Amino acid sequence: MSEHDRELVSPEAALDDHAVESALRPRTLDEFVGQDRVREQLSLVLRSAQQRGTAPDHILMSGGPGLGKTTLAMIIAAELGAPLRITSGPAIERSGDLAAVLSTLREGEVLFLDEIHRMARPAEEMLYVAMEDFRVDVMVGKGPGATAIPLEIAPFTLVGATTRAGMLPAPLRDRFGFVAHMDFYSPEELELILHRSARLLGIELLDDAAAEIARRSRGTPRIANRLLRRVRDYAQVRGDGRLTLECARAALSLYEVDDEGLDRLDRAVLDALLRRFRGGPVGLSTLAVSVGEEPETVEIVAEPFLVRAGFIARTPRGRVATPQAWAHMGLTPPPDAAFGAAALFDPDEEP
């Protein structure tokens, strides 16, 4: 599978997505579509802090890629009228890296730490103290003679984002005063997002075309906007520039995004699960090897949607295909096929 095919319906941001995403991002909570419960709760947290004249509690947002966590972090800073500093867990390899960031924060600044679950453990321990006491302990010297020198830092608000909340240590998770879980979006919400994006991009998007794109966007705004741009390309080159239903269907068929929003990787996973493993159960690593992908790629890119859409069940014994998967792939299950009746297990566990 080519990188282009995989990236089209992947919730992860491609390099060329960032400039367009920046132009399409809502700037205020009122402009933000969807996540109504989170928006209402967040509005209360921010407004009450402003009325008290204090920094709001630290905020943790969890949910899949492409659901708006980074956008909300930017909106939080804008609503507070505060500067925003952006970094990520993988960039914090040592406690010194975190100390360098924290020591240069200005009072009231918002620090957005993406993929916070991937931060190095020594940095996590430093962050505990910084979040509670606005202090970092800088180690001077080495070995038994090393001394910790406390360094006061300016009060700040940490906004953490994670796609794997279960990987966060409890001491870190408990230090966030507000925890928000980002849900997948309804087709109706995605249609509103698509129409807004089309206006900003100067695209003539018909209602039925918007509904078709939304239905195949896996509940994820990032994917919806990406598909919108590919349908626009198709309409520009092979049509009259208008995004009609026929144009949307033809473009999405060309890019191998089917009626349920499945792409080539999704169908490869289902095909292997059904044909090679008779519907399962099968472990993640074995399933990933069978489609020539890394386990993390299958787990992060394909599996969340396949589980949510009802094609795969995660059971204590492994991944199991559902009757819906057999029907979608046009196959007949064997008489002894398992259908994932067992209780689902924690998404961060590996059978």
Swiss-Prot record:
ATP binds at L24, R25, G66, K69, T70, T71, E132, D133, F134, R175, Y185, R222. GO terms for molecular function: ATP binding; ATP hydrolysis activity; four-way junction DNA binding; four-way junction helicase activity. It catalyses: ATP + H2O = ADP + phosphate + H(+). Residues 259-351 are annotated as: Head domain (RuvB-H). Residues 186-256 are annotated as: Small ATPAse domain (RuvB-S). Residues 4-185 are annotated as: Large ATPase domain (RuvB-L). The RuvA-RuvB-RuvC complex processes Holliday junction (HJ) DNA during genetic recombination and DNA repair, while the RuvA-RuvB complex plays an important role in the rescue of blocked DNA replication forks via replication fork reversal (RFR). RuvA specifically binds to HJ cruciform DNA, conferring on it an open structure. The RuvB hexamer acts as an ATP-dependent pump, pulling dsDNA into and through the RuvAB complex. RuvB forms 2 homohexamers on either side of HJ DNA bound by 1 or 2 RuvA tetramers; 4 subunits per hexamer contact DNA at a time. This is Holliday junction branch migration complex subunit RuvB. It comes from Thermobifida fusca (strain YX).
